[in-house]
């Protein structure tokens, strides 16, 4: 046996081997040690190998899904090795013959299908990543991602600078790459951020055989029947289906043909922005408190998954967004239809995942019932939607898809399945009585034999005088007679010992058998096996009917999800007083009465109101001389705790929700399409990469300044705060100028550097705004209103006092602040605004090199050490440098 184990283990390196032995999966050697630690189960030993004890642990087959889930969550992959013949067949080959075993499946994070292993509200993506190296040095990447539990299959292509954002959007559970790509130092940091990366041999990513492998998987002669793909996309797609073939071993899950996602069809959002805005998870990693949690009113698991997909990938096509908004508007206007549809959806099962399990031979009776109930829900939904006059395009398309599944299949399933269904088909009892005559006859014979056992138990109890005598059954002994230890001697003594044969002694019971009981057991076993065999045949026939109707079932499942999301957004709009946004191709960004969707709900739960605010980043009307009433960049100043960060985030979230196809938390919103969303909000270090908080901030700011186009929306909070005052002020100053002159994008910039407000005099599209506060008897009251103007102080000491700093520290801080304010730093900066030229737009590939000899001004600058200077010394040095400038 151990020789067989070692042979199978050698063929599956890097995976924990679940080796089937009877009712357990056993693990040996290092696998046992790893599993014992990960699962918290006892490590024992079994025999010896090369003179050393063999470590061993095991898990019961009936609970294996739970243990698999824990191992996968811990980052392990598992090979499941089953017995492929009956032990009796092995014995016929000889007493020392080992039962044949084979690996039937590789369980990896990206190839899960069982409900017990999956999050019902989230997709489970396997992603293949392929790279093409260009002679210009600019790499291109193709991504193919598949959820085998729902049959979704997508491909796209992107540049190296878009790769991180694309991976963050898809959020795969497992990524497969070539071993060459896995060892590439340029991608090392990015790959380490992913939850599970599996390197594969280079031939898995062989572009020359990609089309052949795809055609083979989908059983088509040419690629014409599949989506048009680039050669690189086909390479990634072929790698993905090849890996699925290898892990599913003989079970090829049906997949939808790959759908190609065009570049630029969705809003690009980098990983830092996703984290900062807490779209699907809070910074603490929790779903609760995220935007997804706040807006999710879906009734089905499939609807929740689709909502998460849409939230991760807002559209950039106005027509597609309008179609989504039209569906939401129709269900917002018709409250009765919305409520009725949501009530029907509450009963709709997860048809796509049920179908996937049936296709892979892992389904059960409840999956068949799910398909039956899904078709019934489709009929109910169609009947309710028929009352809509002129349904919008999105709802009409969903109605058409709901007509697809076979009603004959639903009727057959309704006739076949019983009321109370077991989880596993091997348990039997799922076919309705009267559906199949042969099955009914086998069941009667089986059940009548069981009545004979009950009568035999009563007779044995009477004959022995042991009223507590029981006839029981287990998989090891079969049927047996059981008595307590105090009555055992009676059965082991004459004359009863001629009838009762001793089989087993336990702590409190003794077990016996009889020749009569053995005969009855054989009859029951034969009848039971025949009944179960007939049921399993019926199950396979019904599953085959469902699989043949697979495309129609999957389309209907997607239609349910689309209706669920539309009805969810409609419910959200009514509950939270959201309004339909106007989306167009302009550069407008005009929000009236905007609110933060998450914070508003949190305040509502405590009975507090949320203060709504306007924001207009639309281009000012010509001429653009002066700041006008609005500008493309808002410079926001105000105290700590006043709500600046909330204001920044709420406008980003409003834009995102609008392009997802949701109504938005505002009284009015007009938004020109945003192609990229950038957020630099919050502070965190990255110790694993040796980055300080300030370094992380600068890296993220660099990405924004290098990539933001005029169609981007940028929100920046407290740029420059992590370094010396003048350094930070200078960086913030230059960043604003770059956004204004080079990126020319819509932006919100919050700062405590009040000196920067003077820039609005020179930058015509920079608009000053401030968060209003009120002082009352020495206390600061935060009004959370955003108004035109500039703050002259941050009230940091008042906030520090509210936080509980000792009174002595507060008093000293006030004294120091008074002396610093007496130096009137702000007026000096305003002089600089007048003296310094505007930001000069340079090539993004680098700055021009200085020419000529070093000037006295440069030498003087080199001699300065800003970190060692007091504010007064720095100011004096600045005047001295100004005096060295050539006279004009």
UniProtKB/Swiss-Prot annotation:
List positions binding ATP.
638-645
The record's annotation in Pfam families points to: MutS_I (PF01624), MutS_II (PF05188), MutS_III (PF05192), MutS_IV (PF05190), MutS_V (PF00488)
Output the GO biological process annotations, alphabetical, semicolon-separated. Answer: mismatch repair
PROSITE patterns for the chain: DNA_MISMATCH_REPAIR_2 (PS00486)
**Gene Ontology molecular function, alphabetical:** ATP binding; ATP-dependent DNA damage sensor activity; damaged DNA binding; mismatched DNA binding
Highest taxon, organism lineage:
Bacteria
Gene3D superfamilies, sorted: 1.10.1420.10, 6.10.140.430, DNA repair protein MutS, domain I, MutS, connector domain, P-loop containing nucleotide triphosphate hydrolases
- Positions of the region Disordered? 249-271
Question: What keywords does the record list, in alphabetical order?
Answer: ATP-binding, DNA damage, DNA repair, DNA-binding, Nucleotide-binding
Name any GO cellular component annotation: cytosol
Q: What does this protein do?
A: This protein is involved in the repair of mismatches in DNA. It is possible that it carries out the mismatch recognition step. This protein has a weak ATPase activity.
Q: Which family does it belong to?
A: Belongs to the DNA mismatch repair MutS family.
Q: What is this protein called?
A: DNA mismatch repair protein MutS
Q: What organism, scientifically named, is this protein from? A: Nitrobacter winogradskyi (strain ATCC 25391 / DSM 10237 / CIP 104748 / NCIMB 11846 / Nb-255)
Name of the gene encoding the protein in the UniProt record: mutS
């Amino acid at each position: 046996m151990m020789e067989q184990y070692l042979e199978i283990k050698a063929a599956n390196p890097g995976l924990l081997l679940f080796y089937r032995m009877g009712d357990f999966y056993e693990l040996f050697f290092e696998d046992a040690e790893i599993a014992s630690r990960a699962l918290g189960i006892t490590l024992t030993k079994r025999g010896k190998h090369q003179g050393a004890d063999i470590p061993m642990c095991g898990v019961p087959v009936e609970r294996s899904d739970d243990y698999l889930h824990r191992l996968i969550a811990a980052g392990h992959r598992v090979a499941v090795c089953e017995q492929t013949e009956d032990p009796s067949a092995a014995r016929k080959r000889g007493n020392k013959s080992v039962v044949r075993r084979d690996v039937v499946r590789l369980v990896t994070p990206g190839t899960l299908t069982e409900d017990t292993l999956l999050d019902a509200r989230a997709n489970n993506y396997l992603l293949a990543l392929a790279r093409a190296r260009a002679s210009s040095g600019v790499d291109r990447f193709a991504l193919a991602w598949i959820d085998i539990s729902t049959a979704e299959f997508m491909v796209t292509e992107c540049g190296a600078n878009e790769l991180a954002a694309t991976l963050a959007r898809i959020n795969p559970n497992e990524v497969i790459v070539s071993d060459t790509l896995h060892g590439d130092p340029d991608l090392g940091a990015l790959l380490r951020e992913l939850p599970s990366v599996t390197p594969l041999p280079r031939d898995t990513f062989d572009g020359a055989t990609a089309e052949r492998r795809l055609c083979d998987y989908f059983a088509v002669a040419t690629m014409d029947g599949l989506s048009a793909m680039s050669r690189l996309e086909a390479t990634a797609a072929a790698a993905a289906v090849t890996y699925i073939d290898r892990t599913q071993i003989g079970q090829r899950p049906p997949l939808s043909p790959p759908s190609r996602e065009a570049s630029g069809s969705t809003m690009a959002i980098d990983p830092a922005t996703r984290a900062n805005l807490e779209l699907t998870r809070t910074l603490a990693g929790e779903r609760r408190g995220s935007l997804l949690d706040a807006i999710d009113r879906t009734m089905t698991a499939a609807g929740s998954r689709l909502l998460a997909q849409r939230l991760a990938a807002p559209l950039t096509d106005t027509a597609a967004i309008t179609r989504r908004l039209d569906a939401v508007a129709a269900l917002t206007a018709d409250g009765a239809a919305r409520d009725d549809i949501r009530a029907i959806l509450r009963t709709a099962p997860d048809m796509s995942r049920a179908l996937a399990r049936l296709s892979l031979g892992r389904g059960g009776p409840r999956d068949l019932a799910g398909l039956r109930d899904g078709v019934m829900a489709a009929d109910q939904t169609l009947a309710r939607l028929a009352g809509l006059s002129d349904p919008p395009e999105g709802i009409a398309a969903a109605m058409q898809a709901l007509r697809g599944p076979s009603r004959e299949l639903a009727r057959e399933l309704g006739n076949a399945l019983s009321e109370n269904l077991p989880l596993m088909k091997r348990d039997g009892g799922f076919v309705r009585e009267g559906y199949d005559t042969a099955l009914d006859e086998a069941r009667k014979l089986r059940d009548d034999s069981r009545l004979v056992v009950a009568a035999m138990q009563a007779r044995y109890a009477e004959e022995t005088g042991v009223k507590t005598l029981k006839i029981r059954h287990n998989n090891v002994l079969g049927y047996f007679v059981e008595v307590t230890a105090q009555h055992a001697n009676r059965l082991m003594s004459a004359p009863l010992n001629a009838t009762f044969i001793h089989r087993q002694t336990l702590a409190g019971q003794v077990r016996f058998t009889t020749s009569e009981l053995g005969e009855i057991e054989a009859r029951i076993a034969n009848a039971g096996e025949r009944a179960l065999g007939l049921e399993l045949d019926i199950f396979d026939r019904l599953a085959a009917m469902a699989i043949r109707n697979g495309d129609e079932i999957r389309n209907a499942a997607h239609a349910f999800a689309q209706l669920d999301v539309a009805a969810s957004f409609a419910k959200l709009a009514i509950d939270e007083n959201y309004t339909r946004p106007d989306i167009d191709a302009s550069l407008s960004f005009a929000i009236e009465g905007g609110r933060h969707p998450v914070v508003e709900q949190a305040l509502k739960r405590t009975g507090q109101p949320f203060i709504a605010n306007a924001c207009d980043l639309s281009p000012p009307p010509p001429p653009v001389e002066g700041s006008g009433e609005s500008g493309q960049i808002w410079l926001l100043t105000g105290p700590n705790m006043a709500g600046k960060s909330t204001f920044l985030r709420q406008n980003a979230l409003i834009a995102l929700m609008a392009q997802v196809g949701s109504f938005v938390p505002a009284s009015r919103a007009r938004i020109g399409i945003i192609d990229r969303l950038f957020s630099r909000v919050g502070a965190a270090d990255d110790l694993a990469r040796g980055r300080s908080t300030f370094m992380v901030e600068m890296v993220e700011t660099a990405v924004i300044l290098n990539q933001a186009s005029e169609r981007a929306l940028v929100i920046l909070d407290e740029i420059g705060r992590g370094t010396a005052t003048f350094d930070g002020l200078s960086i913030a100053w230059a960043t604003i100028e770059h956004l204004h002159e080079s990126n020319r994008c819509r932006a919100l910039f919050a700062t405590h550097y009040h000196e920067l407000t003077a820039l609005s005099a020179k930058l015509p599209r920079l608009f000053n705004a401030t968060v209003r506060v009120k002082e009352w008897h020495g206390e600061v009251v935060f009004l959370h209103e955003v108004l035109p103007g500039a703050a002259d102080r941050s009230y940091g000491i008042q906030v520090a006092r509210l936080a509980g700093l000792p009174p002595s520290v507060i008093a000293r801080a006030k004294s120091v602040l008074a002396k610093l304010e007496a130096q009137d730093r702000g007026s000096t900066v305003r002089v600089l605004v007048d003296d310094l030229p505007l930001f000069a737009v340079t090539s993004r590939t680098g700055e021009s090199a200085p020419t000529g000899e070093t000037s006295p001004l440069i030498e003087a600058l080199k001699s300065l050490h800003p970190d060692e200077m007091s504010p007064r010394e720095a100011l004096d040095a600045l005047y001295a440098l100004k005096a060295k400038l050539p006279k004009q």
